């Protein structure tokens, strides 16, 4: 299989440089944040309080809880970070529905006892990949946006220090760069399952989702190459491709999904290639 590409610096033309900077709290170790600012080519503000920042709309902010993406100014919503130990993902790890969870059903974990090799081609903050890894899947994750990649890498590092999470994180390998390039080079049957969750216009009104999507929209935008991702995924998956979509949204342009697993706000379109092993 091809080696993953690495891309840690924002493009020179990126407008993010005008709205995003890196800073840290008095309780955080500044070295990691300062190195990140250098790698990404972003302005370094040192110790600041996000609500007092006026020149930038967003901060990559390191505090005692880890790295976060934080809107600035008075009244800004709280930080967005990759968190697997506590909060929603911690509760889901301890009390989740096992292989009956929607993403696990879509990947096919109720149909096979074989450990699946899954490529999460659009990893984001890694929540679905963490669920699948907690159920035994060997996960390869790609996140091409360097800001989101930094958040996810930090979350996985912190989780690796937790006794309960460390075995799960050991089944997750994160790469930077574009999964589309990797899939186009990988060839047939490179992985068992490819999982896609492209960015889409989100209409969920819950406060958490709204906060996360507001910030993500500024940093990532939409994935305009979703149909290309699907085509490449179908060319390198052994058993199936799974695409997460809003429940009422149309399928990605291309072949029609053969099956769907639906939840309250989202669904999983399934593109089978061959039957999963028993």
Curated annotation (Swiss-Prot):
Alphabetical keyword list: Cytoplasm, Methyltransferase, rRNA processing, S-adenosyl-L-methionine, Transferase
GO cellular component labels: cytoplasm
Pfam families per the UniProt record, alphabetical: SAM_MT (PF04445)
Localization per record: Cytoplasm
Catalytic activity entry: guanosine(1516) in 16S rRNA + S-adenosyl-L-methionine = N(2)-methylguanosine(1516) in 16S rRNA + S-adenosyl-L-homocysteine + H(+)
Enzyme class: transferase
Residues given in the record as S-adenosyl-L-methionine binding sites: 143-144, 197
Domain of life: Bacteria
GO MF, one example: rRNA (guanine-N2-)-methyltransferase activity
SUPFAM superfamilies reported in the protein's UniProt record: S-adenosyl-L-methionine-dependent methyltransferases
Record InterPro entries: 16SrRNA_methylTrfase_J, SAM-dependent_MTases_sf
EC number: 2.1.1.242
PANTHER family given in the database record: RIBOSOMAL RNA SMALL SUBUNIT METHYLTRANSFERASE J (PTHR36112:SF1)
Summary of the function given for this chain in its UniProt record: Specifically methylates the guanosine in position 1516 of 16S rRNA.
Family: Belongs to the methyltransferase superfamily. RsmJ family.
Protein name: Ribosomal RNA small subunit methyltransferase J
Organism from which the protein derives: Marinobacter nauticus (strain ATCC 700491 / DSM 11845 / VT8)
């Amino acid at each position: 299989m091809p080696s993953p590409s690495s891309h840690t610096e924002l493009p020179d033309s990126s407008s993010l440089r005008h709205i995003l900077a890196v800073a840290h709290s008095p309780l955080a170790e500044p070295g990691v944040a300062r190195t990140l600012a250098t790698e990404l080519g972003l302005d370094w503000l040192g110790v600041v309080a996000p609500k007092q920042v006026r020149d930038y709309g967003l901060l990559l902010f390191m505090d005692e809880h880890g790295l976060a993406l934080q809107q600035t100014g008075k009244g800004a919503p709280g930080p967005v970070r990759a968190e697997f130990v506590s909060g929603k993902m911690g509760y889901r790890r301890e009390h989740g529905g096992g292989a009956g969870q929607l993403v696990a059903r879509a990947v096919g974990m109720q149909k096979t006892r074989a450990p699946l090799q899954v490529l999460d081609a659009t990893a984001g903050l890694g929540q679905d990949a963490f669920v699948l890894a907690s159920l035994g899947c060997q996960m390869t994750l790609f996140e091409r946006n360097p800001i989101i990649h930094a958040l996810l890498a930090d979350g996985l590092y912190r989780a690796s220090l937790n006794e309960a999470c460390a075995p799960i994180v050991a089944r997750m390998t994160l790469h930077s760069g574009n999964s589309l390039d990797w899939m186009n080079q990988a060839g047939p049957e490179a992985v068992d399952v490819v999982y896609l969750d492209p960015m889409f216009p989100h209409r969920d009104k819950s406060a958490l989702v709204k906060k996360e999507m507001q910030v993500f929209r500024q940093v990532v935008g939409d994935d305009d190459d979703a149909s290309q991702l699907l085509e490449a995924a179908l060319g390198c998956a052994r058993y199936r491709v799974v695409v997460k979509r809003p429940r009422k949204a149309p399928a990605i342009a291309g072949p029609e999904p053969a099956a769907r697993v639906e939840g309250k706000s989202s669904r999983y379109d399934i593109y089978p290639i061959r039957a999963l092993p028993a």
